[in-house]
Amino acid sequence: MQLLKDRIRKDGIVKQGNVLKVDSFLNHQMDIELINEIGKEFKRLFEKEKITKILTIEASGIGIACIVAQYFNVPVVFAKKAQSINIEGEVFATKIESFTHKKTYDVIVSKKFLKPSDRVLIIDDFLANGCALVGLIDLVISSGASVEGIGIVIEKGFQSGGEIIREMGIHLESLAIVDSMNAEDGTVVFRGDK
Amino acid sequence: MQLLKDRIRKDGIVKQGNVLKVDSFLNHQMDIELINEIGKEFKRLFEKEKITKILTIEASGIGIACIVAQYFNVPVVFAKKAQSINIEGEVFATKIESFTHKKTYDVIVSKKFLKPSDRVLIIDDFLANGCALVGLIDLVISSGASVEGIGIVIEKGFQSGGEIIREMGIHLESLAIVDSMNAEDGTVVFRGDK
């Protein structure tokens, strides 16, 4: 998605350790106009999948998922990072390791909101090692629903998550795949760039 | 807002301890169509305030704030619950006590995203004791920006938050104010009900 790549080049900040900061437009301050364009693009890419529900994970996926959901006319469900699982039995639960925060979360979705008949589109802002996505896929499978697609705003193509998910045979679309970045001169190379 | 009150009566669940669960349409599963109507109503209520930015706090406020922001054509900034404040100097920070989770969070907003010229509308799903809101107001004041309004979806009118905020002279609008609820028969009494 050219608009997104242009914006990453303009306002993204490359930091040491392969960190790409997009907090001025995507995950701290949010440019709603840009995210609407992202919503239209996901609609185009997943139009045929007869999506009934959009699933994401708190926190930074929620706003994107809500804007995207308008183009599919379906509800959003966001998985919660649980303090403790004391609602056993009423929820689907999984564990997700966060490398950013160096801890493991219990992540839950109420059984009321994922049903075997649901055709789920998973939406998230970033895909790196894929831990969060694998956890979300696990929640959907637990419910008997199907993962009909995964829409990612920015994929770090040099990490393994994208490959893991694609090898599962899931329809994954990333609107910008970063193949490399350089913290010294701030440049970003996207997959498909000449 | 009648549509919202009707929905709370229909799908809200009253639990012991003055807990009102609205997780089927507002803060776990999200009914985007309803939230669009909420957005239109906030636009009507705060139309004159020349809002330049919407501020909320993760996690459940984010989706609502993003949908609402579309009616104001402004960006959303969400305050983050910090793991630790190791970015001192670059952020406005405050502490917010959560009674639900029985802990105190450091809450931060990057200094890049709140400027003295900003006219801020704060959006959140619930107002009870007001701790989260007072923290967000504190962040805005730290930045030199002005709080032009606060839009709340559901206020627990029998808790002190609403009174505290209104006594500050801030333009607070709650779309549904619950004056009492009864866990035994599941009834909810809204302010203004006959």
UniProtKB/Swiss-Prot annotation, chains A, B:
Could you tell me which cysteines form disulfide bridges?
none
Q: One of this protein's Pfam families, by short name?
A: Pribosyltran
Question: What InterPro entries does the record tag this protein with?
Answer: PRibTrfase_dom, PRTase-like, Pur/Pyrimidine_PRTase, Xanthine_PRibTrfase
Q: Which Enzyme Commission numbers does its entry carry?
A: 2.4.2.22
Q: State the Gene Ontology BP annotations.
A: purine ribonucleoside salvage; xanthine metabolic process; XMP salvage
Localization of this protein: Cytoplasm
UniProt-recorded name of the protein: Xanthine phosphoribosyltransferase
